[in-house]
A protein has these predicted regions:
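C-terminal accessory segment of soluble enzyme catalytic cores
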Residues: 1-3, 278-279
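Solvent-exposed, non-transmembrane regions of membrane-associated and secreted proteins
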Residues: 3-244
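C-terminal single-pass membrane-anchor helix
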Residues: 234-281
């Protein structure tokens, strides 16, 4: 009876360990499916808009950005600018667009604000900074978590180098930015996030060092002309998540086989021992 209990305990321990090992991959896969669906829904809703709708949304965003550019303290007092939540909210879900970083295989919906609920599953637009629609004297800041066991998000943002590009899609615009500055600052240091007169910037922000999170990694991009080949390319979550969902069970299979072989060997050894005792008596 004691041996049977030991076997059951070992099996339970194994499956608990297997669940712990698979959790990050499976959870990330579910999150990426959610992100992909959110982007697809956004794109479908955008396709239904008329040219007049596009113009109205962009005019509202440009007017908002003009207010941000005119206020040097906008980042510290975002409540000064009413109407933020509704500007560019085409779907009514808070999504204003999506960001694609091909080098690290990331495509994330961009939501209004940087609440923890947003940053757990997607990218958030930092309130008090320019909306990401481009234009002179704009500087949008997009933030996402790093190192979550449930989602990759900006985990690999540190792999970007000066000269790499990323795109932001808002309504029918695909805006391309080339990384021109990478810096690490304290959370209280915000000078690198302010609007620069005449410049069109987007900064990607996440915590660093990995797992410690005492500083902020800022990856700034300057606006460049979008190449035709990038205007219709999407790095979907489905495309980049197939591999982990397949490889995780493959990695777990050897452990399962080892356990099964051990159980089989132990059972045979016990039977053999019992047989020898029976012959002795």
């Amino acid at each position: 009876m004691k041996k049977n209990k030991s076997t059951i305990i070992l099996i339970l321990v194994f499956f608990v360990g297997l669940s712990v090992m698979l959790y990050p991959t499976l959870s990330d896969y579910v999150n990426q499916r959610h992100q992909s669906h959110a982007v697809a829904t956004y794109s479908a809703d955008v396709d239904k808009l008329s040219d007049a709708d596009y113009s109205a949304y962009f005019e509202a965003a440009d007017a908002f950005n003009a207010q941000i550019a005119a206020d040097p303290d906008a980042l510290y007092f975002p409540d000064r600018f009413p109407g933020y939540e509704s500007t560019l909210d085409v779907t009514g879900t808070g999504i204003m667009g999506y960001i694609t970083i091909s080098k690290i295989g990331v495509e994330l919906p961009i939501y209004h604000g940087t609440s923890d609920g947003v940053l757990q599953v997607a990218a958030g637009h930092l309130e008090g900074t320019s909306l990401p629609v481009g234009g002179a004297s704009t500087h949008a800041v997009i933030s996402a978590h790093r190192g979550l066991p449930s989602a990759k998000l900006f985990t690999n943002l540190d792999q970007l180098e000066v000269g790499d590009t990323f795109t932001i899609t808002v309504l029918d615009r695909v805006l391309t930015y080339e990384v021109d500055q990478i810096s690490i600052v304290l959370p209280t240091e915000t000078d690198n996030l302010k609007v620069v007169d005449g410049k069109d910037y987007v900064t990607l922000m996440t915590c660093t060092p990995y797992g410690i999170n005492t500083h902020r990694l800022l990856v700034r991009g300057r606006r460049i002309t979008t190449p035709d080949k990038l205007k219709h390319i999407r790095v979907t979550a489905d495309a980049i998540k197939i591999e982990p969902i397949i490889t995780a069970p493959i990695m777990a299979l050897p452990l399962l086989l080892v356990l099964l072989l051990w159980l089989l060997f132990s059972n045979r050894k016990r039977k053999s021992t019992r047989g020898e005792k029976h012959e002795t008596h």
